[in-house]
Amino acid sequence: MASWDNLGELSNIAQLTGLDAVKLISLIVRAASTARLHKRNCRRFAQHLKLIGGLLEQLRVSELRKYPETREPLEQLEDALRRGYLLVNSCQDRSYLYLLAMGWNIVYQFRKAQSEIDNYLRLVPLITLVDNARIRDRLEYIERDQCEYSFDEEDKKVQDALLNPDPCTNPTIVLKKTLSCSYPNLPFNEALRKESEKLQVELQRSQSNMDLGSCEVIQHLLGVTKTVESTIPEKETNVKAPEKKGSNYSESKGETAKSFDDDDDYPKKQNGDYPKKQKDTCSTQRCSSQVPYGHDLVSSRGSYSDEWHADLLGCCSKPALCLKTLFFPCGTFSRIASIAKDRPMSSGEACNDIMAYSLILSCCCYTCCVRRKLRQKLDIAGGCCDDFLSHLLCCCCALVQEWREVEIRGAYSEKTKVTPPACQYMEH
């Protein structure tokens, strides 16, 4: 029995147990009508299942369950329909930004779902039990009804804007346009907060499944939402409390004037030019509001303590990294050492250190010391003997494991990930 990319958790499938295929198809049709994303794909999927439901309604399903040759295929068909319902329902309940970012993956799941349901339908010996031309014609029509699932052009443009942002594109405008359609009854800041909560849930699910690709996408989306959040609180507060606007403004104005008067070295405004100090303060505030990529994963590092998430012998899961480390170990080692020592280390410096320790036959001692510092930084259990044996038996595997662990935990140094500042504009 196939599973569709982490869809269909056992707890959710158990809630649908007891429903026959016809009732499950009805649930899918209702869920498709309320989908927030992939609406066209949900409608096509539901329309295809309507054809199957119309056929099953004419059969005595209770009678078919009495025979083992038809009972098992029916149960497999119902399991596939349950996962199909969870797929359609996820387009309503899961994070809108996550579904948008994983657009083509969801499209692939729709294609796989329809193919699996059709395959199980062919296993049911309907033609031998209900032998008439009308049923055969409808079966042939179902087989010919091969829907084409695709990603909507508008959603694709939004996905490109969020995942591959143009430095001159304001993410606030993009998010306001998309979230206003997804949350029509919520103000923008509430919708953004709700999306952040859902993204945190998606992040935990991806981390538990060790899905590095999804973790990076979700971390990027969280960085975008936090960057946008930092630009709207003052405006949203003024909209929600207009009666306090005058008093707050006068108080802030008085405090600002007082601080300007108390500073003897602060230059006065002359000839319509604002003082340089005020510009520096504004630029400092703008820079401090930016959220570095991967910040959330680093802040939640405590949840990963006391164990390695990357297997020592699992280096082949990243062939490119494995080959790069095999032929150029200094490059991977320098990145690991930069994080373990909290200071940047170039590949040349790492190569010099390794060659120097190799002259006294203690290269493994040096690299295992860096591994120990990395364990202490990431709060991973272990001992010096384990570190030494890991680098002695297979130094390449140990380096790949350490860098994969850094990627899983998002424990990049601040200089490893750089996010360009958002475009700024003046309000008149």
UniProtKB/Swiss-Prot annotation:
CDD domains per the UniProt record, alphabetical: MLKL_NTD (cd21037)
Alphabetized Gene3D superfamilies for the sequence: Adaptor protein Cbl, N-terminal domain
Subcellular location per the Swiss-Prot or TrEMBL entry: Membrane
Topology with respect to the bilayer: Single-pass membrane protein
Domain of life: Eukaryota
Pfam families: MCAfunc (PF19584), PLAC8 (PF04749)
Protein name per the record: Cell number regulator 13
Species, as recorded: Zea mays
